[in-house]
């Protein structure tokens, strides 16, 4: 079921929060900061996909600190993150809706965390 959901939203502007396996909790604690979950995204932009095919997975923060509006330019991103980010890639001004964020639980239920650019149809109402 999870594979079907992921195939329906990727590539695109949907971030998916998934629970980590117990064996990975300690190893990735610096990333999940005690939540036991990580968010993943598969972008649609061909240039970025080509880069990722060569580099492998990329660990990156959102384009904004939690609760702040998403950065629309490198200048805004640098105000948020400064030298804490190793690489900024100029992609022009980014205008539009932020990504949709969903969370898939261990029981395969899907919770809408943030409605964004993409409407998701697999959301479990009881979450």
Where are these regions (language model features)?
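Active-site-adjacent structural elements in enzyme catalytic cores
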Residues: 1-127
